[in-house]
């Protein structure tokens, strides 16, 4: 039952997710592609976490943050991908009112935590390159744990705010969500409550997370660039640049898609374009991050070779 009588209103008890396409052939193709991407995402990020745990050479701050980033990437992808895959297999994909709120909150939680972790990683690179003599003190285990815990708390607070407002909305009319997951924007359009205040508050909260983390990243890399340009050694410059390249690539991909989805005016792109970019943000990026950090990082490549060597010798 999709509707329930509540007082003088008919409340929605479930939503219909319209997904990416109605074409049956394209649904099969997309199911196969996205399933493969999801499996690579899980295996790639799990491998990153395990490699960092078993390799003593990787037991320092940058890889501590990277292991948590891998966990968050798995969480972000898993919050929407399994349900999206189900959408391809059945004609009418429904999600309960409670399930919709939980899915939306999980996606926002992991998305927010990723922003904070990327900022923490930028700060770590700043300390390593600009203040190498103080690095071990300023980036102690205690400080790293505090930064990671702070990232999770920040993500929890942002997601809790969105969950609070979602469950305060009254949905009494159409229940067809033109998306492949319960995103806040299309749900607001379906609400028959006054959403003006909630939209302002949530926009401010999400905008604050984005602006604060972008500011930290921008300032960190500004100082890093100044420090690198002052280096006289070409080898030193190359080494400093190489330690930042992977993180800069991940930051560019992540914030580039966030900007397209949440910052650009809705009139400038269609709903279908928004869906495609959302797939890249929530499905592709979690798969790409382990590849970005492993292919461009000599320490990780060295750790992989050592672990494979140990396995071969057994």
Swiss-Prot record:
GO cellular component, one term: plasma membrane
CDD domains: 7tmA_OR5P-like (cd15416)
Annotated localization: Cell membrane
Keyword Disulfide bond in annotation: yes
Transmembrane intervals: 29-49, 58-78, 103-123, 137-157, 200-220, 241-261, 275-295
Extracellular side: 1-28, 79-102, 158-199, 262-274
Keyword Membrane attributed: yes
The entry's keywords: Cell membrane, Disulfide bond, G-protein coupled receptor, Glycoprotein, Membrane, Olfaction, Receptor, Sensory transduction, Transducer, Transmembrane, Transmembrane helix
Molecular functions per Gene Ontology: G protein-coupled receptor activity; olfactory receptor activity
Membrane topology: Multi-pass membrane protein
Gene3D superfamilies (alphabetical): Rhodopsin 7-helix transmembrane proteins
Residue pairs linked by disulfide bridges in the UniProt entry: 100-192
InterPro entries xrefs: GPCR_Rhodpsn, GPCR_Rhodpsn_7TM, Olfact_rcpt
Residues glycosylated per entry: 8
Stretches of the chain found on the membrane's Cytoplasmic side: 50-57, 124-136, 221-240, 296-314
Pfam families: 7tm_4 (PF13853)
Biological process, per Gene Ontology: G protein-coupled receptor signaling pathway; sensory perception of smell
Protein family (similarity comment): Belongs to the G-protein coupled receptor 1 family.
Role, per record: Potential odorant receptor.
PANTHER family reported in the protein's UniProt record: OLFACTORY RECEPTOR
Name recorded for this polypeptide: Olfactory receptor 5P72
Organism for this UniProt entry: Mus musculus (Mouse)
């Amino acid at each position: 039952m999709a509707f329930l009588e509540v007082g003088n209103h008919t409340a929605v008890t479930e939503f219909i997710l319209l997904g990416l396409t109605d074409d049956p052939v394209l649904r099969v193709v997309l199911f196969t592609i996205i399933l493969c991407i999801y499996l690579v995402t899980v295996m790639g990020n799990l491998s990153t976490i395990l490699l960092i745990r078993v390799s003593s050479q990787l037991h320092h701050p940058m890889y501590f943050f990277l292991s948590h980033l891998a966990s968050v990437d798995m969480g972000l992808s898993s919050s929407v991908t399994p349900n999206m895959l189900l959408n391809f297999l059945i004609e009418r994909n429904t999600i309960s009112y409670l399930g919709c709120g939980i899915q939306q909150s999980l996606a926002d939680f992991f998305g927010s935590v990723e922003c904070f972790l990327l900022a923490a990683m930028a700060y770590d690179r700043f300390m390593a390159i600009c203040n190498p003599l103080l690095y071990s003190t300023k980036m102690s285990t205690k400080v790293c744990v505090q930064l990671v815990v702070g990232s999770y708390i920040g993500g929890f607070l942002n997601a809790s705010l969105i969950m609070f407002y979602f469950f305060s909305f009254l949905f009494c009319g159409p229940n067809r969500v033109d998306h492949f997951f319960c995103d806040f924007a299309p749900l607001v359009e379906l609400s028959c409550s006054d959403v003006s205040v909630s939209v302002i508050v949530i926009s401010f909260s999400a905008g604050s997370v984005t602006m604060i983390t972008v500011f930290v990243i921008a300032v960190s890399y500004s100082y890093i660039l100044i420090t690198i340009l002052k280096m006289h050694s070409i080898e030193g410059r190359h080494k400093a640049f190489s330690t930042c390249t992977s993180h800069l690539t991940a930051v560019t991909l992540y914030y580039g898609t966030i900007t397209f989805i949440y910052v650009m005016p809705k009139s400038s792109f269609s709903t279908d374009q928004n869906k495609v970019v959302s797939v890249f943000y929530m499905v592709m990026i979690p798969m790409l991050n382990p590849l970005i950090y492993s292919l461009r990082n000599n320490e990780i490549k060295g750790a992989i070779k050592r672990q494979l060597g140990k396995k071969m010798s057994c």
